[in-house]
């Protein structure tokens, strides 16, 4: 009996072990059932499109890696299915997602209305370029975490709901190219982080007063029905487009001396030198011609108007008559002066006339225009003329003056003038056409600088800019290396575009940055090549190296070396196991590497280069955890101002922006501030902005500054994953450097060379001194 039991135990043991191994794997892979139900309903509402992995019932979106799905453990946090020719509708299941943060169905053909209930956890909501109808739902007001929303290029109608009071974190809003009417709701004044607002091509009306207290940097209200004066604060917005509204006509008239106004507009006092103040002029100033206490009956006013019209008509007749008399007198005087000269020339022509010389004057003119092409001066003189700079706008260059001089006939002798005087008897020949502009000269081509305003001007043809070490890749080859930019190769995205992992046939890995069209659309091809050239000149051991580029079929891509350990942001905030590798000494070394990169950009490069987008997501880590800073030299794309729904991602983690950034000011001191924020992340292990924390701890800098010089509080701020393994003195020195970098006044922030020296001194002191504890 005992033998049988032992046999049963031996048989059951492998089965139990298999179950123990299998059950945890099932629990780890299984997607949240609520999310599964939500995505099944979404799939059915879309008409069951062909999307890899997606099914109408059940399934495991996270474990099976459905296309466009990003998960955090078992929760779906993002759905991105862009330009997939989707149809159908969104249905009523979106609100069932428990933790979703991003939804992007842009550039499809989805119709129906936007769901009346939306997931309250949404941060990014993109439905642009579809066929949605109906109005914007009032449930929008429940999205208190919303950062970016784009509903542009749809068929939406109705009025904007007055539900913006809770959307205090909204940074970008685009509802352009719809049929939305009504006025801007009063609750929009609560959008205190809104930097981009696009409402062009709608039927919106009313005034813009509700927007004047917002930190807008990009505002487009073109082709609406807005009226009234534009508030002064809006006129100072760096990118403000407002054509195609009734108040534009008022603005034009207000700066003109024309006596009448458009009948469809309320009369406004002409003020040629006075800008709009945002407040309408007082009633007694609106029509200076009116008498304030004059008769109010219609007869009195009509008689007054008729008198004014009669007097005005009489004045016009007198002016016209006077002008006619004056012109007649001038013509008579001119005829009297010219008659004697014509008579003398007629006598000369009758005495000596040589028919073969009639065209002498014309021939001399044609010498300067052979076959319609201007003849340039001799080579010796041409060199001097070509290098003559334009003195100021509107002034012709010296070469045009020389061409004009060549176009005129050369002086001729008295006898020659007698020979050709017969031409005066005939109508004067029409003047020769003005010479076309000189042919393009390589030395006159000016390519605008793109790294900073002081970069030396390239004097080469924009059609062919030589590249020394940067390889050109075709779009076809990059599609092959990235598997057609597959979702599984997406390793990051930002305001300038998305980054994909590319594997070459030899197995080597690269990172391909596919620039968003809205980030580079204002650059011509030759300007992009110039950008590539300038980035190629940035060479430093702590800066990601550019190895190639692509500019084909309206696509712009940059190919960089690949960093296997991802970004510092991911290492600190997304991977707890990886975070344990980041000892105190490693973090100090990372800060030093990033500081050296910025020191090189600010103080070694000539002219200096401002990064403008420094954050932990742009600090990459290689195999040895050495720091490589990315996106160096791309500031011209950031400042181009053509980034719409992606433009706010620079500020999505709002804590990186220096205080002066709200005023549109960005200098090297702003980079120093952002570097200080990254040092704070290294110190505390916290994100620069964390909405999930309590209100007083959401902004890292605001929370940390009061504690940096408090020894007791400083110890509590340190990242718990360090387990107390850090020298107390080193910690204090590290905090001092941070405090100087994040000063609110730019002039009090240190040079990056000073930061590098301070970090080196801190490391030397630690090596030669005795710390309170030893770092790993």
UniProtKB/Swiss-Prot annotation:
Keyword ATP-binding: yes
PROSITE patterns registered for this protein in UniProt: PROTEIN_KINASE_DOM
Pfam families (UniProt xref): LRR_1, LRRNT_2, PK_Tyr_Ser-Thr
Natural source organism: Arabidopsis thaliana
Main location: membrane
Described function: Not essential for epidermal patterning and not redundant with STRUBBELIG.
Sequence ranges of Basic and acidic residues compositional bias: 381-407
The protein, known as: Protein STRUBBELIG-RECEPTOR FAMILY 3
InterPro entries assigned: Kinase-like_dom_sf, Leu-rich_rpt, LRR_dom_sf, LRR_N_plant-typ, PRK1-6/SRF4-like, Prot_kinase_dom, Ser-Thr/Tyr_kinase_cat_dom
Coiled coil: none
Superkingdom of origin organism: Eukaryota
Observed phenotype of the null mutant: Plants do not show root phenotype alteration.
Biased composition (Pro residues): 269-284, 426-440
Glycosylated residues in this chain: 72, 179, 248, 253, 310
TM segment ranges: 36-56, 317-337
PANTHER family: LEUCINE-RICH REPEAT RECEPTOR-LIKE PROTEIN KINASE PXC1, PROTEIN KINASE DOMAIN-CONTAINING PROTEIN
Family: Belongs to the protein kinase superfamily. Ser/Thr protein kinase family.
Residues binding ATP, per UniProt: 491-499, 513
Domains: entry comment: The protein kinase domain is predicted to be catalytically inactive.
Miscellaneous section: Over-expression of SRF3 led to male-sterility in both cv. Landsberg and cv. Columbia.
Annotated GO biological process: circadian rhythm
One cellular component (GO) term of this entry: plasma membrane
Domain Protein kinase: 485-763
Extracellular membrane side: 57-316
Underlying gene: SRF3
Cleavable signal peptide: 1-29
């Amino acid at each position: 009996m005992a033998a049988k039991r032992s046999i049963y135990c031996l048989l059951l043991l492998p089965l139990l072990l298999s179950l123990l191994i299998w059950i945890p794997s099932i629990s780890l892979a299984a997607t949240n059932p609520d999310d599964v139900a939500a995505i099944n309903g979404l799939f059915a509402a879309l008409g069951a499109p062909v999307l890899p992995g997606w099914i109408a019932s059940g399934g495991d979106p996270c474990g099976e890696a459905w296309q466009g799905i990003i998960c955090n453990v078992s929760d779906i946090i993002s759905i991105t299915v862009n330009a997939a020719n989707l149809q159908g509708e969104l249905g009523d299941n979106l609100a069932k997602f428990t933790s979703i943060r991003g939804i992007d169905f842009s550039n499809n053909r989805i119709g129906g209305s936007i769901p009346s209930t939306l997931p309250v956890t949404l941060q990014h909501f993109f439905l642009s370029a579809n066929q949605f109808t109906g109005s914007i739902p009032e449930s929008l007001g429940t999205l208190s975490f919303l950062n970016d929303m784009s509903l542009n290029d749809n068929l939406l109608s109705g009025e904007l709901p007055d539900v913006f009071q809770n959307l205090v974190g909204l940074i970008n809003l685009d509802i352009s190219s719809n049929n939305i009417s009504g006025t801007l709701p009063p609750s929009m004044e609560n959008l205190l982080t809104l930097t981009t607002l696009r409402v062009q091509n709608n039927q919106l009306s009313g005034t813009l007063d509700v927007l004047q207290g917002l930190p807008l940097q990009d505002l487009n209200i073109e082709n609406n029905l807005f009226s009234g004066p534009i508030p002064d604060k809006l006129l100072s917005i760096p990118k403000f487009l407002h054509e195609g509204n009734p108040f534009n006509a008022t603005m034009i008239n207000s700066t003109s001396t024309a006596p009448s106004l458009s009948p469809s507009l309320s009369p406004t006092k002409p003020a040629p030198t006075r800008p709009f103040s945002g407040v309408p002029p007082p009633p007694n100033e609106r029509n200076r011609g009116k008498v304030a206490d004059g008769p109010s009956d219609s007869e009195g006013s009509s008689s007054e108007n008729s008198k004014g019209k009669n007097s005005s008509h009489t004045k016009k007749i007198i002016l016209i008559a006077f002008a006619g008399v004056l012109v007649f007198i001038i013509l008579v005087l001119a005829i009297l002066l010219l008659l004697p000269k014509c008579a003398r020339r007629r006598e000369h022509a009758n005495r000596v006339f040589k028919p073969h010389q009639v065209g002498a004057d014309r021939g001399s003119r044609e010498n300067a225009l052979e076959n319609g092409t201007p003849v340039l001066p001799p080579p010796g003189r041409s060199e001097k003329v070509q290098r003559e700079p334009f003195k100021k706008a509107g002034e012709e260059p010296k070469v045009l003056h020389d061409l004009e001089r060549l176009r005129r006939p050369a002086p001729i002798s008295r006898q020659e003038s007698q020979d050709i005087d017969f031409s005066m008897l005939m109508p004067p020949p029409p003047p020769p056409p003005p010479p076309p502009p000189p042919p393009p000269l390589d030395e006159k081509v000016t390519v605008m600088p793109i790294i900073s305003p002081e970069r030396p001007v390239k004097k080469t043809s924009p059609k062919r800019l030589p590249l020394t070490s940067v390889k050109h890749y075709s779009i076809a080859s990059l599609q092959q290396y990235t598997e057609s930019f597959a979702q599984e190769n997406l390793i990051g995205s930002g305001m300038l575009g998305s980054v994909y992992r590319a594997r070459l046939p030899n197995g080597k890995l690269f990172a391909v940055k596919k620039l968003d069209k809205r980030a580079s659309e204002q650059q011509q091809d030759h300007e992009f090549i110039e950008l590539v050239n300038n980035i190629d000149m940035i060479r430093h051991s702590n800066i990601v190296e550019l190895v190639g580029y692509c500019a084909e079929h309206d696509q712009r891509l940059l190919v960089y070396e690949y960093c296997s350990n991802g970004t510092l942001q991911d290492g600190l905030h997304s991977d707890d196991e990886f975070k344990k590798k980041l000892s105190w000494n490693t973090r100090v070394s990372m800060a030093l590497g990033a500081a050296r990169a910025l020191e090189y950009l600010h103080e070694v490069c000539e002219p200096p280069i401002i990064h403008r987008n420094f954050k932990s997501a742009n600090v990459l880590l290689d195999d040895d955890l050495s720091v490589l800073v990315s996106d160096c030299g791309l500031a011209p794309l950031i400042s181009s101002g053509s980034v719409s729904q992606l433009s706010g991602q620079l500020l999505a983690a709002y804590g990186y922006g220096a205080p002066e950034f709200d005023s549109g000011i960005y200098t090297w001191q702003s980079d120093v501030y952002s570097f200080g924020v990254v040092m704070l992340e290294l110190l505390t292990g916290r994100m620069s902005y964390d909405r999930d924390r309590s209100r007083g701890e959401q902004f890292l800098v605001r929370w940390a500054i009061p504690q940096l010089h408090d020894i007791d509080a400083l110890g509590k701020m340190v990242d718990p994953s360090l387990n107390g393994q850090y020298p107390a003195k080193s910690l204090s020195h590290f905090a001092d450097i941070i405090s100087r970098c994040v000063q609110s006044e730019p002039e009090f922030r240190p040079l990056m060379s000073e930061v590098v020296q301070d970090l080196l001194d801190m490391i030397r002191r630690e090596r030669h001194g005795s710390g309170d504890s030893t770092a790993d």
